[in-house]
Amino acid sequence: MSEYSYYDNMRDTPRISKSVFIKYDFRDTNNKSVSTGIATTRDLSVGGTKFLCSAAVRKDYIVKLQIQLDKINQVGVIGTVAWVEIPKPGQFLVGIQFQSMPETSKAKIVKFLNSLAP
């Protein structure tokens, strides 16, 4: 039997408004790196994240992320750009859906999110 989570009775991947540092590497449909950088998340869930960056990326681009959950825990995930909004010229709010993540990374994200639960 698995441990009960605050999120068990909510949507599959609840979003938590939390700023954490990430390193990103956007790749086009040919797997060519088109932009790398550092940003902070606007929210985070076990299924994805969103953040603001200056990279003009497109929906369906692949992104490799290193997410710094806290001072000790960092996880690497691969995701797909689900949507892009342009709040101001030169700024891109990017929604990422996680695609590939080791179980250990998923467990760290769940533990981190549970630590933020009321």
Predicted regions and their residues:
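PAS-family sensory domains and close relatives that share small-molecule sensor folds
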Residues: 83-85
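Hydrophobic core residues within well-ordered beta-strands of beta-rich domains
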Residues: 18, 37, 63, 75-77, ...
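A structural signal for short, well-ordered beta-strand segments
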Residues: 22, 79, 96-98
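Short strand-loop-strand
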Residues: 26-59, 64-66, 95
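N-terminal helix initiation/capping motif
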Residues: 1-44, 114-118
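Conserved hydrophobic positions within beta-strands
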Residues: 41, 79-81
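Short, charged beta-turn/beta-strand-edge "cap" motif at the junction between a beta-strand
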Residues: 68-73
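C-terminal output/interaction extensions
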Residues: 2-3, 12-16, 89-118
